[in-house]
Amino acid sequence: MSKKVQAVLSGLVLTGALLMPAAGPAVAVEPVAAKAIPSGATKTLTAKTLQVDFQYQETGYWCGPAATRIALSARIAAPSQQQLANELPTTTNGTDWIGQVTRVLNNHLGTGWYETKEMPNDPPTQGQRDLLWNDIVLDIDNNYPIVANIVAPASNHPPGYPNYTIYHYFTVIGYDSADMTVLIADPAGFAPTATYWLTFNQLATLIPPKGYSA
C-alpha cells in the first residue's frame, strides 16, 4: 500500500555538488520576495517548516549523505555523514541515484514512507509538477523532509551558486502555499545562509532529469 493511500485512510490527508562548465538553456529565475527564514519548526494557516539538525557537507562530493542526514534529523538522531556515505554508497563521483537515498531513509526510519519519484521531462509536465507540490505538502505536514537531486545550470541557480552547472542534493524542509515557496536546507554552503526560500516553480525546474525522495 502506498503512503498516499495510507495517509488518506488514516485521515492525514551531484551527484555530489560537482561543478561542470555549461551554459544550459535560458531559464527565467524567479526571485523570492524578501521573507523571514524560520529558525525552527513553525506552522501557520498556509505554511509549515520543520526543525532539523543542519550540517554542511564535509567533502565536495558528500552532498547526498549530508542532505540525507538533514532529512533524517527531523525524526531521529541522525548518523554521521561518513556512515551515510558508506551506506548509500557515495564515491568521489558523488551519489549516483536518488533511489539510493530513498532506501537509506527508509532503512533508518524503519518505514516504507519514502518513495523514489523520477522527473525525466525537462521542463516537467503539469502532472509531475502537481505531484511534486502534493508530495511536499503531504510529507512536510507529516514531518518528513524531502531530499531532491538537482541539476542547476548557470542560467537557473539557487542563491549564491557559482557560474557553472551544479549537480547536487539538498533537502526541502518547509513550504508556504500563500506564495508557493519552499524552504531549502542546502549543505553546499554556496548561499549566505544554510536555509533559504525558493519559488516552487524554480524547484520544479531544478530537479529534471533527476528525481526526489518523498
Each PLM stretch: what is its role?
Residues 2-107, 152, 160-163, 178:
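Active-site-adjacent structural segments surrounding the nucleophilic cysteine of cysteine proteases
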Residues 29-31, 36-37, 83-214:
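Conserved active-site-adjacent core of cysteine acyl-enzyme catalytic domains
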